[in-house]
């Protein structure tokens, strides 16, 4: 039986708790300790007989043996806490994104190498069985030479979403370049999967063009589009918004010289051979924790090791450099309304715009869109070796 701990039990930490409880029920794990800066959680955990800490450093000093530790804390703390856990010789399951800046990611990678322990990242869409099947198709070159990988994520968020944590929607937070938004938070899963598919097809990103926008009264972005080119000629097109009329599943379409494929989350894959559908998990984080357990016990490959996230961090960083700034879309292009005491904003025509842009392999600024502004093409070669 493995011994584990969780840093960050509030917010998304609850999903990790559910996953851990499932493994505990299966007698695969025991939860030795939890940590959260909010001390009001203490009585609940002490009643359960689980050690509770408000400082992760105290947890690391006080708990002698842990087989792995899960970090589900605000984005600005991810790399710092993960580095400390690795320095204590503890394997880490880290909430996404692992880092915002390439130099921050490089330090975390160095810390992992020095520790000799693994750091896995909770990009839950990498655990989707339909996505894993698609990855294998590309590795086997069953679609031939890949030409385009197009990802769309039309999500809907309300104003209350940004009240969930003080850092949500922030471009910077307490001096940290947080860059919260579609690229680094809700739709980062989609971007990460696209780049993993490109990598499976031998594609290393060499340039990025990006456009970043906002319709909500935030400092970060809530709408984006990117064009990424790889050294072997693959073009990736990423379209995302949190201002859709209704939320639709994240989707990736792939075009190759020998066929095409469509993946939709969760559990849908369409190829020339037909459609495969997999039953969705009630809590996708379950699969990630089961994978972590199987890696530690049986050596099963991780869905998303830290090393596989490098391109995502590089592309995300380049996107903000390319866009130069986040452009506020004028209210004349936005619908605003109240819903059950909450407040919603929708970008008028965003679904049709994304569909048309994807069909033309174009960015918003290339579609005669009145509010769109083009970005600079950023060369990534200097980051790659």
Where in the sequence are the language-model features?
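Predominantly a Rossmann-like dinucleotide-binding segment in NAD(P)-dependent oxidoreductases
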Residues: 120, 125-209, 214-217
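Glycine- and charged-residue-rich phosphate/anionic-cofactor binding loop of Rossmann-like
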Residues: 29-32, 298-311
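Contiguous beta-strand/loop segments that form the cofactor/metal-binding neighborhood of enzyme cores
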Residues: 179, 185-302, 316-320, 332-385
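Hydrophobic residues in well-ordered beta-strands that form the structural core
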Residues: 94, 119-121, 263
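Short, Asp-centered acidic motifs that coordinate Mg2+ and/or phosphate
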Residues: 33, 67-68, 148
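Helix C-cap/helix->beta junction micro-motif
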Residues: 27, 88, 114-115
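N-terminal Rossmann-like dinucleotide-binding module
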Residues: 1-48, 382-384
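Beta-loop-alpha module in the N-terminal Rossmann-like domain of NAD(P)-dependent dehydrogenases
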Residues: 10, 16, 50-111
